[in-house]
A protein has these predicted regions:
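Alpha-helical transmembrane segments of multi-pass membrane proteins predominantly involved
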Residues: 1-205
């Protein structure tokens, strides 16, 4: 999953970004399913199924169709160059490892490594949202961040199923909100580039 997060930062084609995100979601569902099996926590199988169906299949397909329908520019425009973004990603990953491994000294090694991995994925998702101008790739960054949250949550023993379900549905709701937002930008500015808003704001001053 961490490799997929770096691949999302590196990739400069929207459809490839969607494919990588779908692969990350599938890996998440496998990880959660494995946790459910090894820890005898059957309710996590529902979480794994939700991750697989929603973020591994439904959401990527929906975004793909939305891109085709809107005629969105297929290249990903970045605020920062790929090289600098990857270096920032490595720095954030190192930071997450140092923080988690230092804070969770009393926990077992498997839990510590899992939490460090989850935090790194969360930070890389935030980095993707910051360094991308295209609204669609920012949606993917947000959902990649949420993948990290779910991965961290599965490591918390006794996490109520209702919380996991609410997290899954919050992603679906956020998708609809972002979709409406994208359609509005396209309708008003004939672009899904967030920079279009900055130009309009500058013209109104």
């Amino acid at each position: 999953m961490l490799v997929a997060s770096f691949a999302l930062l590196y990739q400069d084609r929207i459809f490839a970004v969607l494919n990588i995100f779908a692969a990350q979601a599938i890996l998440l569902s496998m990880a959660v399913g494995w946790e459910a099996w090894t820890q005898q926590r059957p309710h996590l199988f529902i979480t794994a199924a939700l991750a697989l169906c929603l973020k591994g299949i439904i959401i990527p397909v929906a975004l793909h169709k939305m891109i085709v329908r809107l005629g969105v520019h297929r290249d990903v425009e970045q605020v920062v160059g790929v090289g600098k973004t990857l270096l920032l990603g490595l720095a954030l990953t190192s930071l997450s490892l140092m923080l988690v491994l230092k804070i969770t000294v009393a926990a077992d090694s498997f839990t510590r490594e899992g939490l460090a991995l989850a935090l790194a994925i969360i930070l890389l998702g935030m980095l993707m949202m910051i360094t991308r101008r295209n609204a669609v790739t920012q949606i993917v960054g947000f959902m990649s961040l949420e993948n990290g949250l779910i991965l961290a949550a599965t490591g918390a023993r006794g996490m109520p199923l209702v919380v996991e379900v609410s997290v899954a549905f919050s992603v679906l709701i956020a998708l609809f909100v972002f979709a409406v937002f994208v359609f509005r930008i396209r309708e008003r500015f004939d672009s899904v580039d967030i920079e279009a808003l900055e130009h309009v704001r500058g013209d109104t001053k």
